[in-house]
Amino acid sequence: MSRSGQPPDLKKYMDKKLQIKLNANRMVTGTLRGFDQFMNLVVDNTVEVNGNDKTDIGMVVIRGNSIVTVEALEPVGRSS
């Protein structure tokens, strides 16, 4: 959540493939399906990436406080 108390503006990332870096040197890729004001994410078709190993873990909820960065892996339009 931003410092101003506003919820994150992730609408433009909905249904887009993302790479999400998490604490403890973890990383996942998947399609964003939902989020809330605490930046908890619902990610579908999720793959956990650990070096050269990739593990399909399906649909997951990622707590916002464990997210370090979010990067789009496909073009993202502007939110309205």
UniProtKB/Swiss-Prot annotation:
An example molecular function term from Gene Ontology annotations: mRNA binding
Family listed: Belongs to the snRNP Sm proteins family.
Lineage: Eukaryota, Viridiplantae, Streptophyta, Embryophyta, Tracheophyta
Source species of the chain: Arabidopsis thaliana
PANTHER family in the record: SMALL NUCLEAR RIBONUCLEOPROTEIN, SMALL NUCLEAR RIBONUCLEOPROTEIN G
Any Pfam family matching the protein: LSM
Entries under PROSITE patterns matching the protein: SM
Main subcellular location of this protein, as a coarse class: nucleus
Domain Sm: 5-76
BP GO terms, sorted: mRNA splicing, via spliceosome
Task performed by this protein: Probable common Sm protein, is found in U1 and U2 snRNPs and may be part of the spliceosome.
Keywords from the named record: mRNA processing, mRNA splicing, Nucleus, Ribonucleoprotein, RNA-binding, Spliceosome
CDD domains recorded: Sm_G
GO CC term, one of those recorded: vacuole
Location(s), subcellular: Nucleus
Superkingdom of the source species: Eukaryota
The protein's name: Probable small nuclear ribonucleoprotein G
Signal sequence segment: none
